Design a protein with these regions (language model features):
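Long, highly charged, low-complexity internal segments
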Residues: 2-44, 55, 151-268, 297-301, ...
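Short glycine-centered, acidic/aromatic-flanked micro-motifs in structured strand/loop junctions
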Residues: 69, 246-248, 277
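Hydrophobic/aromatic-lined pockets within catalytic cores
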Residues: 83, 87, 110-114, 135, ...
Length: 334
């Protein structure tokens, strides 16, 4: 095999001025811009790597191309845009794996899929990219020209911003209001009043609660029923990017960007963290046998005792955090 790689996207949709130089100047009368067909351009910052990949694609001793990018929509798009721009016309296979253990890679190569099976995924990715272009380019230019200010608009960005603005407005307009409840402590046991019909344990009606307190004061309490239930609280799921950013914000007051930067260094430079930009909180089954070795690697410094004990414990046969169906492009962060 000859192995080459991208650096994220090497090819993207062309800018408006690449279709016609007049579009370099933003004018309302030019809108909407609707390229047909859309053109592709090589990203300038990574053009050298694109040329390196293109050279491998067109080698005479290469008879087949295997796409081995992330097992997801965006990973498919990364590879397909490179192949389309490079004019690749060789038979296409797909390596579809979400884990990079030796076992997963070997099994993936032993069961390569036809590239045709993933053409609908590529079509979906292109649809998303073109929708982003059409909304982003046209709406951003329209807003900027209309209001003579640099305004940005996006298919995902703008609805998300609207949600934040709506929530901020609710917080600003919130008027605190006192509420009342009843609590009694008898022989070390705490009792909380609960309304029979609604189940509410508090009320905004101060007079109602004061009257209830007067009626109950001085009267003996009678226990009419006792219900005991055993509840099992499952351990938390493993981290994905968002959950780890939340945890770091809560514990250390890190911003989302700070957390991602730290994770990226741990992943790229120190090789002690798996791929950080994942949205999955589960592991694939092939990762399970590697956990003991990973725990031993963590048995240093203050973690020596706990990690060492866990490493000696047998792995569960069907752990809750292993679920092939819920692993997306990448498994959870470990």
């Amino acid at each position: 095999y000859i192995v080459t790689w991208g650096l994220g996207h090497l090819v993207t949709l062309a800018d408006p001025e690449d279709y016609d130089k007049k579009y370099k100047e933003w004018k309302l009368e030019d809108l909407p811009l609707q390229p047909e067909p859309f053109r592709l351009e090589v990203i300038r910052q990574t053009a050298k790597q694109y040329q390196a990949v293109k050279a491998q694609i067109h080698r005479k001793d290469v008879g087949e191309i295997i796409i081995a990018t992330d097992a997801g929509r965006e990973g498919e798009l990364v590879a397909r845009l490179i192949l389309k721009k490079a004019g690749a016309d060789k038979p296409l296979k797909r390596l579809w794996i979400s884990s990079v253990t030796d076992k997963a890679i070997r099994e993936g190569f032993a069961s390569l899929k036809s590239g045709k099976e993933y053409e609908p995924l590529y079509d979906a990715a292109m649809c998303r990219a073109e929708a982003d272009w059409l909304v982003g380019i046209n709406a951003t230019r329209a807003l900027t020209c209309k209001y003579n200010a640099q305004l940005s608009c996006g298919r995902v960005q703008t609805p998300t911003l609207a949600m934040i603005a709506k929530r901020e407005e609710q917080i600003k307009n919130f008027v605190p209001k006192p509420y009342y409840g009843l609590r009694a402590s008898v022989k070390g046991i705490s009792f909380v009043w609960q309304e029979q019909k609604t189940g509410n344990t508090s009320s905004f009606d101060k007079k109602k609660m004061e009257e209830l307190q007067k009626r109950l004061s001085g009267h003996p309490m009678q226990v009419t029923a006792v219900k005991r239930t055993v509840k099992r609280t499952p351990p938390p799921l493993l981290y994905d990017l968002t959950e780890l950013q939340r945890e770091a914000s809560r514990r250390f007051d890190y911003s989302a960007k700070e957390t991602l930067n730290i994770m990226q260094r741990l992943y790229e430079n120190h090789k002690v963290l798996t791929y950080p930009r994942t949205d999955s909180r589960y592991l694939s089954a092939d990762i399970l046998p590697t956990l003991t070795e990973r725990l031993r690697a963590c048995a240093v410094g203050p973690y020596r005792g706990l990690a060492g004990r866990l490493a000696k414990s047998p792995l569960p046969e069907k752990p809750f955090f292993v679920n092939e169906g819920k692993v997306s492009d990448h498994h959870a962060i470990i």
